[in-house]
Amino acid sequence: MKKIFYIISAFLLFAVACEPNNTTDETPVVGATSLTYAVESIADHEAVIVKPEDLEEGAPVVIVLAEDLELRPLSSPVEETPNVNFKAAEHCLIGRYALCVIATSSNDDLAFLTDAKALFPGTSKFYLLSYRNGLSYTAAMQMPDAFAAYGCVSGEIDVNTYKTNNFTKPVSFVHVHATGNAVCKWNGVQNKTVSVPLCVGAIAAVNECVTFKETDLLPREGKGRVSCTHYLGSESGCDVKLYSVEGTNGGWCDEEFEVYNQIWNFFKTH
């Protein structure tokens, strides 16, 4: 398989997200580090693999399903790197994981995920995140044992897909969504897409979560309130988190709330 490798040195300042209890177990990271990029073709899907240059063997892999491979790190001074404008590309330096971002469409057959995982022999754990689509929900229904945890950022699931599939096994899932999102509606669109609370609630029900906890992150001056509903108590050990951001946009990557840090904090506990 043809690969094109790029290594960039970037001086990055990372904002660390605030935990729901207003405390953090990490400190901001400032320094020089390197990312490696590999351009791949996975079952006719374009993909970019991003990872720290010195990543440990067997480190976790986060597979991201996105309709556009906009992956250029904003801090990258190197024009020759792949088109990587996706904040998670930089966050993998904090989390110490490999990131495999695959170009997809909302109606794709997800069988290619098996080929994607085969690129990382010896990997300890795989996680799946869908970005601006609901494919992680589809995967959680069709292949609940394939990933240690699932996540979704600003995505929605088609009504017909929801009706023709079922959540059959407990899964751990995290979803982040702006309540006023104009593209992927929080409450769904009648006969087209399913509401975010319904999707999250369906997983919590299959997990048989017996309790939930609601918390707010630190206030964000001039920005929408960020709250977290955590469904837990399942005998399976699987839990569900829903981060809701008031307003029409997330304002994800500010000092008070860095979305991919929250997602990784969830993933790494599973």
Question: Whereabouts are the PLM-identified features?
Answer:
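Active-site machinery of serine-nucleophile hydrolases
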Residues: 59-62, 67-119, 226-231, 236-245
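A domain-start/cap signature at the N-terminus of enzymes
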Residues: 18-61, 97, 126, 131-151, ...
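Active-site nucleophile loop of the alpha/beta-hydrolase fold
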Residues: 104, 151-159, 178-182
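Hydrophobic h-region of N-terminal signal peptides that target proteins for export
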Residues: 10-17
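Sec-dependent signal peptide recognition
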Residues: 2-9
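C-terminal catalytic histidine-bearing segment of alpha/beta-hydrolase fold enzymes
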Residues: 173-176, 203-270
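Acidic beta-to-alpha connecting loop that harbors the catalytic carboxylate
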Residues: 68, 178-182, 189, 246-249
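Conserved alpha/beta-hydrolase "acid-adjacent" motif
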Residues: 182-196, 254-255
